From Swiss-Prot:
It comes from Hahella chejuensis (strain KCTC 2396). HAMAP family: Ribosomal_bL32 (MF_00340). GO terms for molecular function: structural constituent of ribosome. PANTHER family: 50S RIBOSOMAL PROTEIN L32 (PTHR35534), LARGE RIBOSOMAL SUBUNIT PROTEIN BL32 (PTHR35534:SF1). The lineage of its organism: Bacteria, Pseudomonadati, Pseudomonadota, Gammaproteobacteria, Oceanospirillales. GO terms for cellular component: large ribosomal subunit. Residues 7-16 have a biased composition (Basic residues). It comes from the Bacteria. SUPFAM superfamilies: Zn-binding ribosomal proteins (SSF57829). One of its GO terms (biological process) is translation. This is Large ribosomal subunit protein bL32. InterPro entries: Ribosomal_bL32 (IPR002677), Ribosomal_bL32_bact (IPR044957), Ribosomal_zn-bd (IPR011332).
Length: 59
């Protein structure tokens, strides 16, 4: 098993963890409907980059 040879300081531990934070999803506003959606994803009503690409059922 891997066992550390020397104890790591709080500073080194913090520097290692500095990249672990989660960022929020980037949101865009659809130009045709004004609806918020995730970048590079189809909106819930089926539009992508201003064009209807998916037929959404009205269940």
């Amino acid at each position: 098993m891997a066992v550390q040879q020397n104890r790591k300081s709080r500073s080194r531990r913090g520097m290692r963890r500095s990249h672990d934070a989660l960022s929020s999803a980037a949101l865009s506003i659809d130009p045709t409907t004004g609806e918020k959606h995730r970048r590079h994803h189809v909106t819930p009503d089926g539009f992508y980059r201003g064009k209807k690409v998916v037929e959404v059922s009205q269940d």
